[in-house]
Amino acid sequence: MQLSFKSKERSMKRKLFVYMFFLVTTISITLLMGLFLFGRLGTTEQDFHKKLSIQSEYFTKNMENYWDDLASMNIALADNMEAILETTLANQGLTFQQLHDNPNAIYSLENDMIQHLGQYLERSNCSGAYVQLDTTINSTLDNAQTQRSGVYLQKTTMSYSKEDLILYRGIANIGKKHGIMPHRKWRQEFDITLVPDYEELKKGNFDYSLSNIIQLPYTGERIALLRVPLVGKDGTFYGLCGFEISQS
């Protein structure tokens, strides 16, 4: 997958800056309070603005580096997930459409993906990573129209140990097989009603997208999702993958 980041990079960075606004404010207030408390506030307004400007430039540079690293890693993640998907389907003699209502094939695919997804998450400075497939394991269920298969991993801490990963979405037995226990609010499949622009995303005619801040179902966690489309060589929309950025 070749993604052109130049056309949307500025708007994406702006959106990330909005999400981090309160952090900037906190840093500024903390600096100001510290200067007052320790009697280091200069006698001129110019001194204060200079110190504040240094802090702002430092934060902005860190955010730019964070975004560049995350964007590059997401490209690699998407390439990896597409390759695993197409290789697994080819080995089983299946088309993507034949994953529908095929629990054995979906099990095999998620089993192949979970370890690689975990490795990308462990290397990232993010709170979660996911791959969501545009198929469902059982279309006879009442809510099957809004359910999609895939794997969603989260970090319990910002460490890099596999023991700190939990399974938020995906087949529980696969997670346990790889030493990853289910989240306390685990569900097997994704609920796409939480993605109001899903039908638009299915067109796959975008490089990447950052969601609005959403609250994860049944939790108090507020997050944004970086979303990159998974599209086959024949134009088939496979699904989405990306990273979770926690507001906390």
Feature annotation, model-predicted:
Residues 71-196:
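Extracytoplasmic/periplasmic sensory segments of membrane signal-transduction proteins
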Residues 136-138, 216-217, 245-248:
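Solvent-exposed loop/turn segments at secondary-structure junctions
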Residues 1-9:
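Short, Lys/Arg-rich, polar N-terminal cytosolic tail immediately upstream
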